[in-house]
């Protein structure tokens, strides 16, 4: 990525208390959207019925404009655009495996994930999209206003321009409230990044049939349901500042104590000294680990094999690379084929939380993944595929996995099955949970772990390459717990 894009993505003007208050007020408003929350599912079903969608797995030789390169066996597009599936050789001193090979998606382009907001009847509303993606288990999910790679919005596919993208290109169509580069899955993407943006407009915006205005409270309420709010919406939500030094959610004293603890967490520990300590912990954790990730031809990837229909690991674990054909009546291109990554099983992603002095803290983890640009990012307490450890003694499991798997259901404060990026991953789902533990749990956690407040995580999200995509999804989920709506 060019330095000019990096600079532009960090150029959004600092938000004052008034803007923070407007974000908070919208998050606390779940009952006065342009579409009532009770009618949202009818609207989504209507959009599904008004369009035609189909995704089918196909053999590799039925891919159109994709081929295995003769010299490298990398899976590439004929135009040299979009992305490639290539090999990665990994060496690290993190975790149980010192080295391995794997396929990985290399998509060098920086995409745009943007939500357009407008004040309607005094409350900020978000223009959201019912977007079909080939990997979605339920076809349509709630997407940002714009969710597009550079190849998409420069029309490399020779299709139409994504609606509303002009609001997010250049400066002048609206006021930029959020603009920060964030990563995607480091296990499946090689150094993939997107601009997470929120742009406010004053003008009237024509609402196309697959779009609707919702308050932040409505979107956060929908996040408590399975497979409704897509990954790209979740990451943008996580980057919205719901606090500053003077402003945050103000809840009545009669509110449920856990909700109060979450709200307090937004404004606790965000002074410069506390943030410096958190950054110092993370930098020290990164310095402990070495990561050497070398791009190699797919033909040199050890322990993986290719059939007519997939590229898979010899042990049947991890994931496979497959091919699909897609048709959709409401996308920029009516039909296409593409490779996708298909995980072998549903993942388990959990954040352990506890109240310290009435303030909620989450146990986060400095985690190394092969595709990260800067070695490690801050992850949830647990992030894994449990099936990969079924034959492993429990004392060799990832830290705190047993606590997550044996948690009392009454301590689970949030639980949803959420989908990962449906444009590249085929039916990739994870169970996301927020689990409360007692106050003396892990008082001195392992050095790669740290208790942090929601406010501290929010401060780090003002910059790039701190929180990974899974942690950002859980930050958005935490916001849904204080923003119960009114």
From Swiss-Prot:
Binding site for dTDP-4-dehydro-6-deoxy-alpha-D-glucose 2: 187, 304, 367, 383-385, 388-389
Taxonomic superkingdom: Bacteria
Reactions this protein catalyses: dTDP-4-dehydro-6-deoxy-alpha-D-glucose = dTDP-3,4-didehydro-2,6-dideoxy-alpha-D-glucose + H2O
UniProt entry keywords in alphabetical sequence: Lyase
Annotated binding of dTDP-4-dehydro-6-deoxy-alpha-D-glucose 1, by residue: 66, 149-153, 421-424
EC numbers on record: 4.2.1.159
Disruption outcome: Cells lacking this gene accumulate the pseudoaglycone (PSA) containing tri-O-methyl rhamnose, but lacking the dimethylamino sugar forosamine.
Gene3D superfamilies in the cross-refs: EvaA sugar 2,3-dehydratase subunit
GO molecular function ontology, one term from the record: lyase activity
Coiled coil: none
Enzyme class (EC, first level): lyase
InterPro entries: EvaA-like, EvaA-like_sf
Matching Pfam families: Hexose_dehydrat
Note: Two binding sites (pockets A and B) for the dTDP-sugar ligands have been identified in each subunit. It seems that pocket A represents the active site and pocket B is a vestige of the gene duplication event.
Functional description taken from the UniProt entry: Involved in the biosynthesis of forosamine ((4-dimethylamino)-2,3,4,6-tetradeoxy-alpha-D-threo-hexopyranose), a highly deoxygenated sugar component of several bioactive natural products such as the insecticidal spinosyns A and D.
Assembly, per entry: Homodimer.
Family: Belongs to the hexose 2,3-dehydratase family.
Protein name, UniProt field: dTDP-4-dehydro-6-deoxy-alpha-D-glucopyranose 2,3-dehydratase
Gene (name only): spnO
């Amino acid at each position: 990525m060019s330095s000019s894009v990096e600079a532009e993505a960090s150029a959004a003007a600092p938000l004052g208390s008034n803007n923070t208050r407007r974000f908070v007020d919208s998050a606390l408003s779940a009952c006065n959207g342009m579409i009532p929350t009770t009618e949202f599912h009818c609207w989504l079903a209507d959009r599904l019925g008004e369009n035609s969608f189909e995704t089918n797995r196909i053999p590799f030789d039925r891919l159109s404009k994709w081929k295995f390169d003769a010299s490298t066996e990398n899976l590439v597009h004929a135009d040299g655009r979009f992305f490639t599936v290539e090999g990665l050789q990994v060496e690290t001193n993190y975790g149980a495996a010192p080295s391995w090979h794997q396929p990985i998606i290399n998509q060098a382009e920086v995409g745009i994930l943007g939500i357009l907001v407008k004040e309607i009847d005094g409350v900020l509303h978000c223009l959201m999209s019912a977007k079909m993606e080939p990997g979605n288990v339920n076809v349509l999910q709630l997407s940002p206003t714009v969710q597009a790679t550079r190849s998409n919005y420069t029309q490399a596919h020779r299709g139409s321009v994504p609606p509303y993208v002009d609001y997010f290109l250049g400066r002048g169509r609206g006021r930029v409230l959020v603009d920060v580069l964030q990563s995607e899955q480091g296990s499946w993407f090689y150094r993939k990044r997107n601009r997470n943006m929120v742009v406010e407009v004053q003008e009237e915006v024509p609402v196309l049939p697959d779009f609707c205005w919702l308050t932040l409270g409505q979107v956060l309420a929908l996040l408590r349901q399975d497979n409704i709010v897509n990954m790209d919406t979740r990451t943008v939500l996580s980057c919205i500042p719901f606090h500053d030094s003077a402003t945050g959610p103000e809840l009545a004293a009669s509110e449920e104590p856990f909700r109060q603890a979450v709200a307090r967490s937004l404004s606790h520990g965000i002074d410069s000294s506390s943030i410096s300590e958190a950054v110092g912990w993370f930098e020290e954790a990164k310095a402990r680990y070495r990561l050497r990730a070398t791009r190699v031809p797919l033909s040199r990837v050890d322990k993986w094999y290719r059939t007519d229909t997939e590229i898979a690991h010899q042990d049947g674990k991890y994931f496979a690379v497959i091919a699909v054909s897609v048709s959709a009546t409401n996308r920029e291109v009516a039909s296409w084929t593409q490779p996708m990554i298909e995980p072998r099983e549903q993942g388990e992603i959990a954040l352990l939380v506890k109240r310290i002095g009435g303030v909620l803290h989450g146990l986060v983890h400095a985690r190394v993944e092969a595709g990260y640009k800067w070695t490690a990012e801050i992850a949830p307490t647990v992030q894994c595929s449990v099936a990969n450890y079924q034959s492993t003694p429990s004392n060799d499991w990832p830290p705190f996995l047993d606590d997550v798997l044996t948690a009392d259901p009454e301590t689970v404060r949030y639980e949803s099955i959420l989908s990962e990026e449906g444009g590249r991953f085929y039916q990739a789902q994870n169970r996301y949970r927020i689990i409360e533990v007692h106050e003396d749990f892990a008082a001195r956690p392992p050095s790669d772990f740290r208790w942090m407040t929601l406010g501290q995580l929010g401060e780090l999200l003002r910059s790039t390459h701190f929180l990974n995509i899974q942690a950002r999804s859980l930050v958005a989920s935490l916001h849904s717990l204080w923003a119960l709506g009114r």
